[in-house]
Regions:
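Solvent-exposed beta-strand sheet faces enriched in polar/charged residues
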Residues: 22, 78, 241, 290-292
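Short alpha-helical
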Residues: 82, 101, 118-121, 203, ...
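ABC-family P-loop ATPase nucleotide-binding domain
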Residues: 1-25, 306-309
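ABC transporter nucleotide-binding domains
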Residues: 16-19, 26-197, 202-203, 207-216
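ABC transporter nucleotide-binding domain
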Residues: 182-270
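C-terminal coupling/interaction segments
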Residues: 2-7, 270-309
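Conserved protein kinase catalytic domain
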Residues: 88-92, 127, 230, 276, ...
Length: 309
């Protein structure tokens, strides 16, 4: 794996737009995956696209990659058609459905994928950025799930793309490997690359994103910096040890969601004072109470529940 290193802060991104979805709707039969959806991906930024399963994230990515056509509206990448060859030469993608032959060695895969591009990175540089120098001569089929993820990341960047799509890139990685990949993504941003990231790890979006877009039921429900998204909810997170069940806690007024973290209840709430009062009334033996400010996860839960209601 690549050595962890500090990356310099990059200059503030300009207003140049790398890709757009303009009033796009996409229907699959009677199902409307996107409804009058608009999005601007700004050059030099990392845009994180968040949403529950089935929200429309994958459909939006497919449209930007030219893998699907909109039912209505306009899709543009670098001012042109996303299906055009000249567009594909400037785009890299790491998708969840990515599969490659298991019998080829890692360097053979990189060499093959690099041949599709006019100005690819040197294989040595690709291996270094992805932190897989030690896997160079290994067959893909011999690798662990996490190692395969890193090779797929290498294949996404080997063409030296200007626009990079990363769909759940850290799935299967342990915490250390995940943070190393974050550093590698930051390095790409310092080189002026544009990244569109989808992830279920909300701390990942919080750590990496310049802008966050939240989608639910085919519509954009929030857009802004991570700080702006978090500021949209006045919620708090209450941690405590209580005899009350998850079901009882979820039924309390003002509770957005509840998780059982190995016996400690984590309560996301928009009305912390009311919830605390109710907890103390219902469980005199409650202990370990801790109240913290809302994070991106809390804001995400509040926004998506608001849309559902």
């Amino acid at each position: 794996m690549a050595t962890v290193q500090a990356f310099p802060m990059r200059a503030l991104p300009g207003e140049q737009i790398a890709a757009t979805l303009n009033q796009v709707s996409k229907n699959y039969g009677a199902v409307q995956a996107l409804k009058n959806f608009s999005l601007e991906v700004r050059a030099g930024e990392l845009t994180a696209v968040l949403g529950p399963n089935g929200a429309g994230k994958t459909t939006a990515i497919k449209l930007l990659l030219g893998l699907a056509r909109p039912t209505s509206g306009r899709v543009s990448v670098f001012g042109g058609d996303p299906t055009a060859l000249e567009t594909h030469l400037r785009v890299g993608a790491m998708l969840q459905v990515g599969r490659v032959p298991e019998s080829l060695r890692v360097h053979e895969h990189i060499d093959l994928f690099s041949s599709y591009y006019s100005q690819p990175l040197a294989i040595k540089q690709t291996l270094a950025i992805a932190g897989i120098e030690s896997l160079r001569d290994r067959k893909f089929g011999e690798l662990s799930g996490g190692q395969k993820q890193r090779v797929l990341f290498a294949l996404a960047i080997c063409g030296n793309p200007d626009l990079l799509f990363l769909d759940e890139p850290t799935v299967g990685l342990d915490v250390e490997a995940r943070h190393l990949l974050w550093d590698e993504i930051r390095q790409l941003l310092t080189l002026g690359k544009t990244v569109v990231l989808t992830t279920h790890y909300l701390e990942e979006a919080d750590a990496l994103a310049d802008r966050v877009v939240v989608i639910n039921k085919g519509s954009m429900i929030a857009e802004g910096t991570p700080q702006e998204i978090k500021a949209r909810t006045a919620g708090k997170k209450i941690r405590c040890t209580t005899r009350l069940s998850v079901g009882v806690l979820r039924a309390l007024a003002g509770v957005v969601d509840v998780q059982d973290d190995r016996g400690t209840m984590v309560i996301h709430t928009s009305r912390p004072e009311d919830v605390l009062r109710e907890l103390l009334n219902r469980d005199l033996a409650i202990s370990g109470i801790e109240v913290t400010g809302a994070g991106l996860e809390d804001a995400f839960l509040a926004l998506t529940q608001e849309k559902a209601n």
